[in-house]
């Protein structure tokens, strides 16, 4: 991002300063997002909330969309204070987001989490997991790998768009949500550990992914069409 900062009209010092706030607060956002949809896990027997358990992130429970939302909020405030073009900064920031998400998914592999359902495909992943309290060997979809590769491909695609076809501030920002939303929506359907919308059968990340992708695509078409005319 620092290497390409000048092309987007952003100072390298502003990137470093923004990361100082965005990184820790994005972790907080990822945790709060997870807690929101699993609130019952953080209640004591008397119904009160266990705030100690809420802050123990080493026990698991971070959701990427919470981190993304918090990062956008932090960037908005930062740009307002520093009088920087938000959409230009956001265009630059999505490249770091994709790299971070691409690498971060391998943490799921190390922790043996965020995998998919059973499959017989040649690239299946063998794991030991507990099913109804019994430890069993399973061959499953390596959904962490799917998303990591999707982010890698998205990064390469957005780099080319930024170099050749970037027409307006916000184009890369919208392209990120369009690309990631579609991929996450389909991959989420394969996972076995999804967050669900308050007791329904609706997968939160799948819904959020498809909705944000649809909105982003519409805004891209409108903005590109307007500029072409």
Regions found by a protein language model. Give the residues of each.
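A feature for loop-to-transmembrane-helix boundaries and adjacent hydrophobic helices
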Residues: 1-229
């Amino acid at each position: 991002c620092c290497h390409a900062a000048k092309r987007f009209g952003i100072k390298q010092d502003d990137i470093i300063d923004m990361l100082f706030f965005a990184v820790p607060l994005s972790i907080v956002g990822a945790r709060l997002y997870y807690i929101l949809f699993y609130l019952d896990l953080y209640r004591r027997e008397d119904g009160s909330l266990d705030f100690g358990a809420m802050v123990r992130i080493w026990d698991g429970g971070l959701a990427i969309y919470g981190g993304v939302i918090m990062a956008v909020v932090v960037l908005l405030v930062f740009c307002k204070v520093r009088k920087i073009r938000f959409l230009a900064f956001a265009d630059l920031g999505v490249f770091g987001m994709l790299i971070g998400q691409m690498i971060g998914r391998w943490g799921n592999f190390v922790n043996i989490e965020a995998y998919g359902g059973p499959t017989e495909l040649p690239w299946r992943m063998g794991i030991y997991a507990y099913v109804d309290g019994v430890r069993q060997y399973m061959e499953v979809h390596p959904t962490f790998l799917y998303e990591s590769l999707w982010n890698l491909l998205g990064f390469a695609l957005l780099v080319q768009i930024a170099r050749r076809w970037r027409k307006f501030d916000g184009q890369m920002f919208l392209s990120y949500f369009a690309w990631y939303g579609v991929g996450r929506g389909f991959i989420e359907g394969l996972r076995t550990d999804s967050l669900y919308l308050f007791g329904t059968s609706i997968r939160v990340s799948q819904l959020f992914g498809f909705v944000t992708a649809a909105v982003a695509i519409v805004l891209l078409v409108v903005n590109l069409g307007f500029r072409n005319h």
